[in-house]
A protein has these predicted regions:
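Short basic, glycine-rich beta-strand/loop surfaces that mediate nucleic-acid
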Residues: 1
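FAD-binding subdomain of flavoenzyme oxidoreductases
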Residues: 4-6, 25, 29-33, 37-193
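Extended, alpha-helix-rich binding/interface surfaces that flank or overlap catalytic cores
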Residues: 21
Length: 193
């Protein structure tokens, strides 16, 4: 449940590395206060943290109903919530994963670095072993869907593991993209007789 580091990408977004046990409600509190636990961070992360403290307030847009959810569990089920119509589920907000495979080997996945060729995916593990995977041929529906593995032609490899419920490997580290918090949040309730 540790916070492992912070960096900025080429788009200026803050990318936060965390262990899977970080609780969403605690993350929200720390982001709103602009205070993150930085023990053990390297110099590059501390520099990004200084920039984070000077930047407009940041937030993590995924909002499942259960605020006590851990980020690892949210990644495992591709969590979404009331804000998903505006921000989508957690999948597009995860930029990196470390995954422990059943045989003990590790995968380090970064969004935008490894893609399937059609429905074939080649992944190189931390031990240097190449995994050759043939992805299922079904077509994902264009509606909200949480059944089966996410697959698409030429897909980003990271997306196969998000929403796989831990069946392909255990997430040991996540990198999530933060966004500038909206200036105003509105809620509307309607009552009808």
């Amino acid at each position: 449940n540790r916070y492992l580091g912070l960096r900025r990408d080429e788009q200026g977004r803050f990318l936060l590395r965390v262990e899977p046990g970080v609780v969403l409600s605690e993350l929200r509190k720390q982001l709103s206060k602009k205070v993150l636990p930085t023990a053990g961070w390297d110099q590059a992360s501390l520099k990004a943290y200084d920039e984070f403290q000077e930047a407009p307030e940041q937030f993590f847009p995924t909002d499942p109903t259960e605020a006590s959810a851990c980020l690892g569990g949210m990644a495992a089920c591709n969590a979404s919530g009331a804000r998903s119509y505006a921000y989508g589920p957690i999948r597009p907000h995860i930029t990196g994963l470390h995954v422990a495979l059943a045989d003990g080997d590790l995968l380090e996945l970064q969004r935008g670095e490894a893609f399937a060729q059609g429905r074939h995916l080649s992944l190189v593990t931390a031990a240097g072993r190449t995994l050759e995977l043939d992805l299922p041929g079904y077509t994902m529906p264009k509606t909200k869907n949480a059944s089966g593995y996410f697959v698409a032609d030429d897909m980003d490899a990271i997306d196969l593991f998000i929403g796989a419920c831990g069946t392909l490997g255990v997430v040991t580290e996540l990198e999530i993209a933060l966004q500038a918090a909206p200036a105003v949040v509105w809620g509307v309730s309607c009552f009808f007789d």
